[in-house]
From Swiss-Prot:
Protein function: Serine protease, part of the gene cluster that mediates the biosynthesis of the secondary metabolite victorin, the molecular basis for Victoria blight of oats. Within the pathway, vicPa and vicPb are probably involved in the processing of the vicA1 and vicA2 precursors. The pathway starts with the processing of the precursor vicA1 by several endopeptidases including kexin proteases as well as the cluster-specific S28 family peptidases vicPa and vicPb to produce 7 identical copies of the hexapeptide Gly-Leu-Lys-Leu-Ala-Phe.
Superkingdom as given in the UniProt entry: Eukaryota
Pfam families: Peptidase_S28 (PF05577)
Lineage: Eukaryota, Fungi, Dikarya, Ascomycota, Pezizomycotina
Species annotation: Bipolaris victoriae (strain FI3)
UniProt-recorded name of the protein: Serine protease vicPa
C-alpha cells in the first residue's frame, strides 16, 4: 500500500510540478542510525556572493553531534556561534547547553555552523577592506539558509532530515539570536521554529540605554557611587583646568592618553562586565569593583541595601586604587601587539592613533576586526553616556562620533571601497522591523537586567512598551539575571532560569509535534487527490 501511494504521489508531482525535494513527506526511517557518526565535522562549499555565483565559493566549517538523534526524519537543532571561532564554542553541541538539551528532548541532532569570516570559514586570505565587502547581513543570512537547503549531512544519507521533511530548529544567543530573528523575518519557511536568547533586534547609534538595566540590577550603593564618579570625571574634563585634568588622568594611571574622550571611555569600560555575569558564577569582576568602591571585604549581594550618603572623594579614591591595581595592569599587553607591550601600557585605549598595529592587522584570526566591520557597517549599538536628564554610569564624552572616528581609522578606503560611513540605525530597522518583530513559531527570552534587553523586544524603551507574548511568538523575561542565562545548564541552579528553560523546551517540543501534524495533513490532502483520481 505504501509503494502504491508513493507511486501515485510521484505521478501527481509530475503533473503539479512539485519538486521532489520539497514534497511534504515523512517516510518512516528505513535506514538504521549510523552509530559510528555520533559526532564529527564537515566542510560545506558556501557561496561567497549569493547574488553573483561567479565570485566563487569558500569552505564553511560545520560540526555535528547525533548522540540523541532518532535517525532519518528526526529533528535538526541548528546553531551558529556568531562572532566567534566555532572551535571555541563546540560545547554547544552537548547537553551542557540549551541546543544539546533540546536535542535530547526531541531526539534531534545538533548541527553547529561557523559564521563566514570567523575561525576556519574564510573567503579570503586576509581581512582587507576590499575583501570584507562580502561580509554583509544579507550574505550572512543567505549562508545559513543555503546550508540548510542544500547540505548533505554525513549522518543523514537518505536526506530524510532535510528541512522539507523534518523540523529544523534554530537556537541562538546574543548576536546569533538576532540572526535567528532576522532570518525568521526575512527568509521564512526554511527553519520550522526558532529560539532567540538575548536577541538585540533594534539597532541604535547612541545606545545609551545599554547601561539602564545595569543601573537597575546592580547594588544600588555601588550604582550611586559610580554615577557620582562619572559625573565628576565629566565635569573635570569638560570644565576643569589643565592641571585638574592631568591630575585626574594621573590618578587613574592614564596620563599617557592624549584625548580626554579616550580617558573617559577607559574609566567607563569596567561597567560593561555586568553583562558577563551568570547565575552560576562564584566570582565576577563587576562585584569585585563594587566591593573596592565601597571598601568592603565581602562580595556584594544582589540585594545589597542602599546605605549612607555618597562620599565622592572616598569612592573616587577607592575606584582609582582598584582600577590601577586590578583592572589596568596587563590590559593592553594581553593583546599581543608589540606597540602595546608593557604591564602598565594604556595605548590600546587610544582610539585616534592610526599607526597602531591592531588597526593594520589583516590576519584572518583577528576576530575583533571582523566584528568591528559588522558594528561599523550594520548594527552600530555603540554604548554611550546617557542624556543629561538622566544619571549615567558611562561618560557623556563618549558619543557615536567617538566610535565613527575609530571606524574610519580601521577601515580606510581601498580600491574605491570603504565601510558604510553613511549607515543609519533606520537602515537595518526598516529592513528587519526592529523592535516591532512579529513572527511565527519564534520564542524570545531576555534577562531582566541584561544590558542588551534595551535593544530587544522586551525593552522598556520600546515605544509601545515591552512586546506582549503570543502563542506564535512567546516572550519570556527571566527575573533577576543578565545575558543569555538560559543557554547554560549550569545556570539551572537559579529557579527562574530553570523555569524559563523548561518552558522554552516544552514549547519547542510542541512545535516539533506540530510539524508532523501539519505535514501529515498535507500528505492526507495528496492522498485524497490520488484516490479521487482513481
Amino acid at each position: 500500500m505504501l509503494c502504491y501511494l508513493l507511486i501515485h504521489i510521484l505521478c501527481l508531482q509530475a503533473v503539479l510540478g512539485v519538486p521532489y525535494d520539497v514534497l511534504p513527506l515523512r517516510i518512516p526511517a528505513l535506514v538504521p542510525k549510523d552509530t559510528s557518526l555520533l559526532s564529527g565535522r564537515g566542510a560545506f562549499q558556501q557561496l561567497i556572493d549569493h547574488t553573483n555565483l561567479d565570485v566563487g565559493t569558500f569552505s564553511q566549517s560545520y560540526w555535528f553531534n547525533t548522540t540523541y538523534w532518532g535517525g532519518p526524519g528526526s529533528p535538526i537543532i541548528f546553531y551558529t556561534p556568531g562572532q566567534h571561532a566555532a572551535t571555541d564554542r563546540l560545547h554547544y553541541l552537548t547537553d551542557t547547553t540549551l541546543p544539546g538539551l533540546v536535542a535530547k528532548e526531541v531526539r534531534g541532532a545538533v548541527v553547529l555552523v561557523e559564521h563566514r569570516y570567523f575561525g576556519e570559514s574564510q573567503p579570503f586570505s586576509n581581512l582587507s577592506t576590499a575583501n570584507l565587502q562580502y561580509l554583509t547581513l544579507d550574505q550572512v543570512l543567505a549562508d545559513f539558509v543555503h546550508f540548510a537547503r542544500t547540505v548533505d549531512l554525513p549522518f543523514d544519507l537518505s536526506g530524510q532530515s532535510h528541512p522539507s521533511r523534518a523540523p529544523w530548529i534554530w537556537i541562538g544567543n546574543s548576536y546569533s539570536a538576532a540572526l535567528v530573528a532576522w532570518t525568521e523575518k526575512l527568509i521564512p519557511n526554511v527553519f520550522w521554529a526558532y529560539y532567540a536568547s538575548g536577541a538585540m533586534v533594534n539597532c541604535m547609534q547612541d545606545f545609551w540605554q545599554f547601561n539602564y538595566p545595569t543601573q537597575q540590577g546592580m547594588p544600588q550603593d555601588c550604582r550611586y557611587s559610580l554615577e557620582a564618579i562619572i559625573s565628576h570625571v565629566d565635569s573635570v574634563f569638560l570644565s576643569g583646568s589643565p592641571e585638574q585634568k592631568h591630575r585626574l588622568k594621573t590618578r587613574f594611571g592614564l596620563q599617557d592618553l592624549d584625548r580626554l574622550d579616550d580617558t573617559a571611555s577607559a574609566l567607563s569600560r569596567p561597567v560593561i562586565a555586568w553583562t558577563l555575569i551568570q547565575p552560576s558564577d562564584t566570582h565576577a569582576q563587576f562585584f569585585e569593583m563594587c566591593d573596592a568602591i565601597g571598601n568592603l571585604n565581602s562580595s556584594w549581594s544582589r540585594g545589597h541595601k542602599v546605605g549612607s550618603e555618597i562620599n565622592l572623594q572616598k569612592a573616587l579614591g577607592n575606584y582609582a586604587n582598584w582600577f590601577t591595581t586590578s583592572y589596568l595592569p596587563g590590559l593592553c599587553e594581553s593583546s599581543g601587539y608589540s606597540d602595546w607591550a608593557g604591564r602598565n601600557n594604556v595605548q590600546c585605549l587610544d582610539t585616534a592613533n592610526p599607526s597602531w598595529q591592531a588597526f593594520h592587522d589583516l590576519a584572518v584570526q583577528n576576530e575583533d576586526r571582523v566584528w568591528d566591520w559588522m558594528i561599523c557597517n550594520f548594527f552600530l549599538l555603540w554604548q554611550t553616556g546617557a542624556p543629561v536628564s538622566r544619571p549615567t554610569i558611562f561618560s557623556r564624552l563618549v558619543d557615536s562620533m567617538y566610535y565613527k572616528r575609530r571606524c574610519k581609522l580601521i577601515f580606510p578606503e581601498e580600491e574605491n571601497v570603504t565601510y558604510a560611513a553613511r549607515v543609519t540605525d533606520d537602515s537595518i530597522n526598516t529592513l528587519t522591523g526592529g523592535w516591532n518583530h512579529t513572527g511565527k513559531r519564534i520564542l524570545f527570552t531576555n534577562g531582566e537586567f541584561d544590558p542588551w534587553r534595551s535593544a530587544s523586544v522586551s525593552s522598556v524603551f520600546r515605544p509601545d512598551g515591552p512586546m506582549q507574548s503570543t502563542s506564535q511568538q512567546p516572550i519570556i523575561l527571566i527575573k533577576g539575571v543578565q545575558h543569555q542565562a538560559d543557554m547554560y545548564v549550569r545556570n539551572r541552579i537559579n529557579k527562574d532560569v530553570r523555569e524559563a528553560m523548561d518552558t522554552g523546551i516544552a514549547q519547542i517540543s510542541r512545535w516539533v509535534l506540530d510539524f508532523h501534524v501539519e505535514k501529515s495533513k498535507t500528505l492526507t490532502q495528496y492522498t485524497s487527490q490520488v484516490y479521487c483520481a482513481h
